[in-house]
Every structure is written in structure tokens, then in C-alpha cells.
């Protein structure tokens, strides 16, 4: 685990974005942890979040021309990541996002920001079922652009309805790499460093045994 990944886990815990306990997911699964990126909701939170996304992007080595944030949650992520890349990595790259409803006046179409072209890095909070990615792919392809990769905050590394995860399905269906700031493996490594969290570690490991990929 790299220093920025440990810092991201601590940041998420401090904002209660990441919680340990017992939670029922939308799928009905009982999970020993919960991650709600919507609680990164202040100016300082967003500034820090962008730095973590930018760090993971640079660390990945994936080459891309433009950041795309799918509406709605991806919009502030794309914006703050673009700012962080410019301020901290001297990479001044364009960004773009879609609006859910097409506008019939003023700025045309359902895209805002730079023209959607070249190699696109899609940024979002998490991938649950991959629906937002599939919708975004239609937009990307319709504009003649290509998907360079996908960056999310957390990869839960668990099976979806099939034997592989929603993330693995996206990688298979779109022949792209999905990267994340942290994974379930990183969470476990973090918990292993914290004796006071042994109870949570046991629960997360048991969950991975049952649902992990």
C-alpha cells in the first residue's frame, strides 16, 4: 500500500465516508463496511479528493487526453481531479461531463466543457452494477472518442450476480483498465496495521471469503 492510499483511507474514515459495522447493501448483502463518497461534501473535502484521484491517475501510467465525469456524481470528481492534475502535477488537461437532460437552448446538446474527443479517462465514485459506465460508453462512442480507462475511489473486489465483479465485467466488455485509489485488499492491509480494529478485520476477511473475486 502506497502512502497516498493509506492517507485516503484515513481521510475517508475521518469524514465517515468509510464505516465499519454491519450494513445492508442495495443488493441485500450484509456487508461489514460501507463507503458513501457523497459525504465528501465541503470545499476542502473536494480539494483533497481531487489530489487523491490525480495521484492514482499519475501512478497508473495510463495515457489519456481528457477527463470525463458522468452525471451526476462524476461531475465534481472530474472537475476537482482536473484542478489537482494542473496544480500538483503540471498536467493541464481538458474535462467534460454530460447532463442527464438535453438542453434545447444556449449551449447545445447534453455535454458541458471541452469537446469529447481522443482518449477519455472516465472518473466516478464507485462501480456497483456498471450501469453508469455503460451509459457513458454510448456517449463516448457517439462522439468518436475512445475509452482509455476508468478511475474510481474504491474497488470492493466482490462478485456481482455472476462469478466476476462488475468491474471485471466492465474491463471485459470495453477492453479497458479500471483503476481505483484503494481496493478491498488495501482496506484489509490497513486493518492489519491496527490491532484495535481486529474485530472489523475478521469480519471483512470473512466477507471477502464469501463474496470476493
From Swiss-Prot:
The entry sums up its family as follows:
Belongs to the purine/pyrimidine phosphoribosyltransferase family. PyrE subfamily.
Question: Corresponding gene?
Answer: pyrE
- Keywords per UniProt: Glycosyltransferase, Magnesium, Pyrimidine biosynthesis, Transferase
Q: Which top-rank group of organisms is this from?
A: Bacteria
Q: Which PANTHER family match?
A: OROTATE PHOSPHORIBOSYLTRANSFERASE 1-RELATED
Which residues hold 5-phospho-alpha-D-ribose 1-diphosphate? 26, 72-73, 99-100, 103, 105, 124-132
Q: What is this protein called in UniProt?
A: Orotate phosphoribosyltransferase
Pfam families, alphabetically?
A: Pribosyltran
Amino acid at each position: 500500500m502506497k502512502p497516498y492510499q493509506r492517507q485516503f483511507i484515513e481521510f475517508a474514515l475521518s469524514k465517515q465516508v468509510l464505516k465499519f459495522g454491519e450494513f445492508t447493501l442495495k443488493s441485500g448483502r450484509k456487508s461489514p463496511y460501507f463507503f458513501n463518497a457523497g459525504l465528501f461534501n465541503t470545499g476542502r473535502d473536494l480539494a483533497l479528493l481531487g489530489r487523491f484521484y490525480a495521484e492514482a491517475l499519475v501512478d497508473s501510467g495510463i495515457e489519456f487526453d481528457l477527463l470525463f465525469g458522468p452525471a451526476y456524481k462524476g461531475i465534481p470528481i472530474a472537475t476537482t481531479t482536473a484542478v489537482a492534475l494542473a496544480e500538483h502535477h503540471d498536467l493541464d488537461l481538458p474535462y467534460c461531463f454530460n447532463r442527464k437532460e438535453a438542453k434545447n437552448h444556449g449551449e447545445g446538446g447534453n455535454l458541458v466543457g471541452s469537446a469529447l474527443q481522443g482518449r477519455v479517462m472516465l472518473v466516478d465514485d464507485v462501480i456497483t452494477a456498471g450501469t453508469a459506465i455503460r451509459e457513458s460508453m454510448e456517449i463516448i462512442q457517439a462522439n468518436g472518442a475512445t475509452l482509455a480507462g476508468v478511475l474510481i475511489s474504491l474497488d470492493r473486489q466482490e462478485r456481482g450476480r455472476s462469478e466476476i465483479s462488475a468491474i471485471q465485467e466492465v474491463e471485459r466488455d470495453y477492453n479497458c483498465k479500471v483503476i481505483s485509489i484503494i481496493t478491498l485488499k488495501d482496506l484489509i492491509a490497513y486493518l492489519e496495521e491496527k490491532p484495535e480494529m481486529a474485530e472489523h478485520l475478521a469480519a471483512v476477511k470473512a466477507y471477502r471469503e464469501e463474496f470476493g473475486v
